[in-house]
């Protein structure tokens, strides 16, 4: 299992477009991929699950991966967060 922490850097937070990018990236991996906010863990391969986190700018998110390509999956998801989803950063 790999656990990484990141912070929402884009001003708009996690809305439909970033949720889709996260899910599309997570689906590429065989590992289970989860996002966790304040103890609420969701499946990162589910756009609706990601949206329900209601993660706004500055929110801390934990990325959790389990499986054969867990390190690559965690790093790919973290890279999306670090890029601010190519949106306006705060």
Where are these regions (language model features)?
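Compact, glycine-rich, soluble single-domain proteins
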Residues: 7-57, 80
């Amino acid at each position: 299992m790999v656990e990484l922490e990141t912070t929402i850097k884009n001003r708009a937070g996690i809305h439909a477009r970033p949720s889709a990018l996260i899910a599309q990236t997570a689906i590429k991996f065989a590992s289970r991929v989860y996002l966790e906010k304040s103890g609420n863990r969701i499946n990162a391969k589910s756009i609706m699950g990601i949206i329900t986190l209601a993660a706004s700018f500055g929110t801390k998110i934990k990325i959790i991966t389990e499986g054969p390509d867990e390190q690559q999956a965690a790093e790919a998801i973290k890279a999306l967060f670090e890029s601010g989803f190519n949106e306006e950063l705060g």
